[in-house]
Amino acid sequence: MATGIALVGPGAVGTTVAALLHKAGYSPLLCGHTPRAGIELRRDGADPIVVPGPVHTSPREVAGPVDVLILAVKATQNDAARPWLTRLCDERTVVAVLQNGVEQVEQVQPHCPSSAVVPAIVWCSAETQPQGWVRLRGEAALVVPTGPAAEQFAGLLRGAGATVDCDPDFTTAAWRKLLVNALAGFMVLSGRRSAMFRRDDVAALSRRYVAECLAVARAEGARLDDDVVDEVVRLVRSAPQDMGTSMLADRAAHRPLEWDLRNGVIVRKARAHGLATPISDVLVPLLAAASDGPG
């Protein structure tokens, strides 16, 4: 059993995981950029879970190394999180990366070269509310690869009541999630929540875009059938009409967007395989401009 657990990035996903750990009797060290006395998760239909802090804001305030470090910052914040990794990690630390995309290990391993880095796919609908607490709709489920480090992390979260699958075909699982994440770009450019996918014209465009992404996923080794296109579009069309996405929230708050790891990656990987990406060629520059300007 892990005796030292640190959570870097107590946002929506991070708060969800921290709350599960706290409920199971663990006391995760909370690390972020905003000082708070604690964090709170409110799952629909359940009692709130308050995780006592403080949320530390300086690596100098904490002692390391820890057994498990859960990195739940946005990928755009990885460089800013490096001092935490330096302070809290060594060769015995398992670093679980709870981020979108398919490049978690490549992006994080340079910041903690001696640690085992475990990419984790998170399936949950968690959203930070204006008052600061996090709303969770339904259950949270994670997928990690196989292997000793991944299984150690999976065992920790299973002990906390989470559903965690160790998938030997993690490549396929990661690309399946990316097909869903990529559609969030439509929400950012339209400024609308999930109800927008109930428009027939948007659904048709979504199918074409997911099919474009699917070709890239297969070239990268993902074993996904043609049926996944309709499956993904049905998923977003059946979501609660008011459901948002972290990238839409970032756009509203004028924060940098995860456009490259959700959408730009499709273009980058496609170029390596000589694949055309006509929809991405329009979508990605607009997302990049929305994120990084100028203007």
Curated annotation (Swiss-Prot):
Catalytic activity: (R)-pantoate + NADP(+) = 2-dehydropantoate + NADPH + H(+)
A GO term for molecular function: 2-dehydropantoate 2-reductase activity
Localization, UniProt: Cytoplasm
SUPFAM superfamilies, sorted: 6-phosphogluconate dehydrogenase C-terminal domain-like, NAD(P)-binding Rossmann-fold domains
Principal location: cytoplasm
Amino-acid positions noted as binding NADP(+) in the UniProt annotation, renumbered to this chain: 10-13, 33-34, 74, 84, 100, 126, 255-258
Source organism, top-level taxon: Bacteria
Binding residue positions for substrate: 100, 181, 246
EC numbers for this chain: 1.1.1.169
GO biological process: pantothenate biosynthetic process
A cellular component annotation (GO) from this entry: cytosol
Active site location: 177 (proton donor)
Enzyme class: oxidoreductase
Keywords: Cytoplasm, NADP, Oxidoreductase, Pantothenate biosynthesis
Keyword Ligase attributed: no
Coiled-coil residue spans: none
Pathway in which the depicted protein is active: Cofactor biosynthesis; (R)-pantothenate biosynthesis; (R)-pantoate from 3-methyl-2-oxobutanoate: step 2/2
NCBIfam families to which the protein is assigned, alphabetical: apbA_panE, PRK06522.2-2, PRK12921.1-1
Function: Catalyzes the NADPH-dependent reduction of ketopantoate into pantoic acid.
Note: Was identified as a high-confidence drug target.
Similarity section: Belongs to the ketopantoate reductase family.
Protein name as catalogued: 2-dehydropantoate 2-reductase
Protein's organism: Mycobacterium tuberculosis (strain ATCC 25618 / H37Rv)
